[in-house]
C-alpha cells in the first residue's frame, strides 16, 4: 500500500472513531485485549496513535486458549509489536483449553478484569466491530432472544471491580479493519478456528451473512447493527421503568403477584426474568418466564415444573417464591 492510501485509511477510521472517544476520556488507563487478529491490531494501532494527544496509558493483554497448535506464536507476534510500540504486554496461558466458547469468554473477561484492577486501569478495551454486533443480533434472533438479547454487545458496560468494558470499534466494519491493517502493514495472526463451521457464529459469519448481503441487503451489517442500537435503547427504557416498581414487586426474595399482574406484559416478562436470574443464578428461558406468569391467577400452593438446579416456583398466597423440588 502506498503512503497516501495509508494516510487516507487512517484519517477515515479516526473520523469514524471520533464518536466513541467520549468512552475514552483523556488520561484514561486502558488494558487493550489483543488477540493478534485484524480487529484488535487495528484497535491497538489507533490507540497507540491517539495516546500522546489524549494522554492515554496503554497496556496490552493477550490470552492463549491453547485451542490449536502454534497458538504461542500469536503471543510472540503481539509481544514483539508491543515492544516496538512501547506498550507493556501481559500474557495469560490456559492451563487446559476452555471447553466451549462461553467458557472461554468467561475466562477472558475474568482475567482481563483482574489484570486491569491490579494495574489500576479504569477500562478494558476490545476490538469488537459493527460486523460482530450485526452477527450477534442475528445469532440471538435465531436463538429466540427477546429485546434485551437482541440489543446486547453495547459500546460500554460494567465488567466488575470498578472496571468498565469499552468497545470503541462498534461503528467500524470488519472489512474496514482489514483494509486498515493492510494499509499499515500490520502482522495479522490468522486463527484457523475462525473457519471451523462447527461453531455457529462462524457459520453465520462465513455463510449466512454473505448470502443475506448478496440476495437481500448489501448493507445488512449496518442494518442489523442499527436494529441492535434501537433495541438496546428501548431495553434500557424498559429496565428503568421496571426499576420504579421493583421495591414494591420484590420483598425478601419473593415476587408479589398482584403488583406483577398490574404491569404491562413487557414489564411482567422483564420482572420475572430479573427475579429468576437472581434466584437461579442463570438467565431463564422463555418457557421458564411463561410458567411463572401462569402462576399469577393459579390457586395457592400451585407449583411449576423444576426450572433449574431442582428449583421451582410456588404460589404462596399473594406471593411467588422459589423453593427446592
UniProtKB/Swiss-Prot annotation:
Binding residues for ATP: 35-40
UniProt keyword annotation of Cell division present: no
GO CC annotations, alphabetized: cytoplasm
Keywords, alphabetical: ATP-binding, Cytoplasm, Ligase, Nucleotide-binding, tRNA processing
Pfam families found in the cross-reference section: ATP_bind_3, TilS
Catalytic activity, reaction form: cytidine(34) in tRNA(Ile2) + L-lysine + ATP = lysidine(34) in tRNA(Ile2) + AMP + diphosphate + H(+)
Similarity comment: Belongs to the tRNA(Ile)-lysidine synthase family.
Domain notes: The N-terminal region contains the highly conserved SGGXDS motif, predicted to be a P-loop motif involved in ATP binding.
Function: Ligates lysine onto the cytidine present at position 34 of the AUA codon-specific tRNA(Ile) that contains the anticodon CAU, in an ATP-dependent manner. Cytidine is converted to lysidine, thus changing the amino acid specificity of the tRNA from methionine to isoleucine.
Protein name: tRNA(Ile)-lysidine synthase
Annotated source species: Gloeobacter violaceus (strain ATCC 29082 / PCC 7421)
Amino acid at each position: 500500500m502506498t503512503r497516501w492510501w495509508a494516510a487516507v485509511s487512517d484519517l477515515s477510521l479516526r473520523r469514524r472513531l471520533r464518536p466513541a472517544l467520549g468512552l475514552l476520556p483523556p488520561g484514561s488507563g486502558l488494558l487493550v485485549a489483543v488477540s493478534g487478529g485484524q480487529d484488535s491490531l487495528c484497535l491497538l494501532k489507533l490507540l497507540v496513535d491517539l495516546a500522546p494527544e489524549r494522554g492515554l496509558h496503554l497496556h496490552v493483554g493477550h490470552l492463549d486458549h491453547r485451542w490449536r497448535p502454534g497458538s504461542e506464536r500469536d503471543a510472540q507476534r503481539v509481544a514483539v509489536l508491543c515492544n516496538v510500540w512501547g506498550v507493556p504486554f501481559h500474557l495469560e496461558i490456559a492451563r487446559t483449553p476452555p471447553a466451549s466458547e462461553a467458557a472461554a469468554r468467561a475466562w477472558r473477561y475474568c482475567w482481563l478484569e483482574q489484570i486491569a484492577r491490579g494495574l489500576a486501569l479504569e477500562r478494558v478495551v476490545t476490538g469488537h466491530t459493527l460486523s460482530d454486533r450485526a452477527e450477534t443480533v442475528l445469532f440471538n434472533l435465531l436463538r429466540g432472544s427477546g429485546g434485551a438479547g437482541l440489543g446486547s454487545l453495547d459500546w460500554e458496560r460494567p465488567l466488575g471491580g470498578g472496571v468498565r468494558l469499552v468497545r470503541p470499534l462498534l461503528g467500524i466494519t470488519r472489512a474496514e479493519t482489514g483494509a486498515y491493517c493492510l494499509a499499515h502493514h500490520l502482522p495479522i495472526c490468522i486463527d484457523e478456528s475462525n473457519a471451523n463451521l462447527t461453531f455457529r457464529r462462524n457459520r453465520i459469519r462465513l455463510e449466512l451473512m454473505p448470502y443475506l448481503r448478496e440476495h437481500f441487503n448489501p448493507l445488512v451489517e449496518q442494518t442489523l447493527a442499527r436494529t441492535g442500537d434501537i433495541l438496546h435503547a428501548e431495553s434500557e427504557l424498559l429496565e428503568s421503568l421496571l426499576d420504579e416498581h421493583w421495591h414494591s414487586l420484590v420483598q425478601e426474595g419473593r415476587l408479589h403477584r398482584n403488583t406483577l399482574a398490574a404491569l404491562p406484559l413487557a414489564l411482567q416478562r422483564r420482572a420475572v426474568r430479573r427475579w429468576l436470574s437472581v434466584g437461579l443464578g442463570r438467565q431463564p428461558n422463555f418457557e421458564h418466564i411463561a410458567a411463572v406468569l401462569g402462576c399469577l391467577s393459579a390457586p395457592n400452593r400451585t407449583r411449576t415444573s423444576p426450572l433449574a438446579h431442582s428449583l421451582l416456583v410456588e404460589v404462596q398466597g399473594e406471593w411467588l417464591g422459589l423453593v427446592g423440588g
